[in-house]
UniProtKB/Swiss-Prot annotation:
Endonucleolytically cleaves the 5'-leader sequence of certain mRNAs. Endonuclease digestion by the RNase J1/J2 complex occurs at a different site and in some cases more efficiently than J1 or J2 alone. The exonuclease activity of the J1/J2 complex is highly processive on substrates longer than 5 nucleotides, on shorter substrates is distributive. Plays a role in mRNA maturation and stability. Appears to have a limited effect on 16S rRNA maturation, despite its similarity to RNase J1. This subunit alone has very poor 5'-3' exonuclease activity. SMART domains: Lactamase_B. This is Ribonuclease J2. It comes from the Bacteria. Binds 1 zinc ion per subunit. The inability to bind a second zinc ion may explain its very poor exonuclease activity.
Length: 555
């Protein structure tokens, strides 16, 4: 079948710009819609009770019949964590490499996804043909194996999404970046490049993964006690380095965390991690071995490194606690928005008696290319237009300046925000009208049922507590039958504040008595009067503003 000429290309970021995480890019080629990555983001500190955040996907749901496929660049949560929610609304094939799809299957199983899914495995030489485009792939190097970039070939030129990448001359696990294929795509003509901006502010080159192995091995060699190493569960390269270093230093390995255990088992089964069975012991058996002969790898329930460490430092972990003399290696960088938690965790570990090795030593290197690598990608692909993605705005802006240094014109670089549309029609390009965008907050099984008002209420409850006022009125005569009864949680300790509670009770009684003297009292008006009076009274007495909930019952 002859491939028709492309008339219109639209590129939209529903996530992954102005932020780190929840990558979701929409490539529209004529009437066909393709999705590149569908990730999640870990909540910021003020998002109380929220488990994860995903992009608003209403734009895709409203055009479900036009969505042809989802393409995944690699298996990190920031890129596959939102696929479950997309597949609940869309019936489309999902393309990814062997490891990426294996991790996705585990995640779908974890979320209880029971709908039929069409997962199609690809490799770097795969080519998939649609009506108006051919989709091909190229190998990239990142902190997880089986990473690829995606190229959509159209008659206007190729649309290339790099995914997360760096150029590493001494990579872990013998991974290689297909520079030849990237150059080949560049020589065939690239219309637009969506390129990783996460390290655009960092000059030079990102250090090689090989630099980490020595530091981790030194930590295991120098410590006479247990060594606990915290990683992201999905950082398979780092896990392999820890296993190799532990074996070299004669240490048994215990793996703490179900998510981490699951990823490790999967990666070993598929051949991405090599380790002998006799290296591993259970967490329960750690105490049976001399401390000098044990290494513990840990990650949190969401795969993040800090949650489990915090519990260990607070003596709240079910199986392991930090002991005096332990060495803790944090082989990761803070999740954006959780830098304060990172700092507090390091402090907690130090208080618990641990020697903490983290950012000051090279126990972690980034999986993202720095400025010289971003220039190399631009020079290999020679795009007509550049769209910096996967970064906060300042990173996108730094990427733009780097591109100008390579000779690109500022007018050919688009610093887009979420919901922006870059539209190519023939030889013309413009920024089109915004599409719906935003965050969907996930709390347990609830998807999108938590908004700013709920988060505000949670903040109020966490700061000043709650005060509930209960009164009972005669249904006919409208006078007070019982109460007011005041119940507080997280506001004041009642036994030490009896005088305050008595005064508040009398204040409510006087408001109710005055209001019920009129025959046509409105409950909403009465509740608001109680709320206003108590707010003013309690703030004058305590300088606090608890959430006040009046309850009126009739008998």
């Amino acid at each position: 079948m002859k491939k028709k000429n492309t008339e219109n290309v639209r590129i939209i970021a529903l996530g992954g710009v102005g932020e780190i995480g929840k990558n979701l890019y929409v490539i529209e080629i004529d009437s066909d819609i393709f999705v590149v990555d569908a990730g999640l983001m870990h909540p910021e500190n003020e998002m109380l009770g929220i488990d994860v955040v995903i992009p608003d996907i209403s734009y895709l749901i409203e055009r479900a019949d036009r969505v042809k496929a989802i393409f995944l660049t690699h298996g990190h949560d920031e890129n596959i964590g939102g696929v479950f929610y997309l597949l609940n609304k869309l019936s489309v094939p999902v393309y990814g490499t062997k490891l990426t799809l294996a991790l996705l299957r585990e995640k779908l199983k974890q979320y209880g996804h029971n709908r039929k899914t069409d997962l199609r495995e690809i490799h770097s030489k795969s080519v998939i043909t649609f009506e108006s485009t051919k989709v091909s792939f190229f190998r990239t190097i990142h902190s997880i194996p089986d990473s690829v970039g995606v190229s959509f070939k159209t008659s206007l030129g190729s649309i290339v999404c790099t995914g997360d990448f760096k150029f590493d001359q001494t990579p872990a696990l013998n991974q290689t970046c297909d520079i030849g294929e990237i150059a080949k795509i560049g020589n065939s003509g690239v219309l637009a490049l969506l390129s990783d901006s996460a390290n655009a502010e960092r000059p030079g080159y990102t250090p090689s993964e090989a630099a980490v192995s020595g530091e981790i091995s030194d930590a295991l060699y120098n410590s006479q006690n247990r060594v606990i190493i915290a990683v992201f569960a999905s950082n398979i390269n780092r896990i392999q380095q820890v296993i190799h270093a532990a074996a070299q230093n004669g240490r048994k390995i215990a793996v703490a965390g179900k998510n981490l255990q699951s990823v490790l088992q999967l990666a070993r089964k598929l051949g991405y991690i090599e380790a002998d069975d006799e290296l591993f012991i259970s967490v329960q058996d750690v105490k049976k071995y001399p401390k000098r002969e044990v290494a513990i790898i840990t990650a949190g329930s969401q795969g993040e490194p800090l949650a489990a460490l915090t519990r260990m430092a607070n003596k709240a972990h079910k199986q392991l606690n930090i002991e005096e003399g332990d060495t803790v290696v944090i082989a990761s960088t803070p999740i954006p928005g959780q830098e304060l938690i990172y700092s507090k965790t390091v402090d907690l570990l130090a208080r618990a008696g641990a020697q903490v090795i983290f950012a000051q030593k090279r126990v972690h290197v980034s999986g993202h290319g720095s400025q010289e690598e971003l220039k190399l990608m631009i020079n290999l692909l020679k795009p007509k237009y550049l769209i910096p993605v996967n970064g906060e705005y300042r990173m996108q802006k730094a990427h733009s300046k780097i591109a100008e240094e390579t000779g690109m014109k500022r007018s050919d670089i688009f610093l887009i925000e979420k919901g922006d549309v870059v539209e190519f029609r023939g030889q013309n390009v413009k920024i089109g009208d915004k599409v719906p965008y935003g965050n969907i907050l996930i709390d347990g099984l609830g998807v999108g049922d938590i908004g700013n008002i709920v988060l505000r209420d949670r903040r109020l409850l966490s700061q000043d507590g709650i005060l509930i006022v209960v009164i009972t009125l005669d249904k006919q005569k409208k006078h007070l039958v019982s109460g007011p009864e005041i119940i507080t949680r997280g506001f004041v300790y009642v036994r030490e504040s009896e005088g305050l509670i008595v005064q508040a009770t009398e204040l409510v009684r006087s408001i109710v008595t005055e209001a019920t003297e009129t025959s046509n009292v409105e409950w909403s008006t009465l509740k608001q009067a109680m709320r206003d009076a108590l707010n003013q009274f309690l703030y004058e007495k305590t300088k606090r503003k608890p959430m006040i909930i009046p309850i009126i019952m009739e008998v």
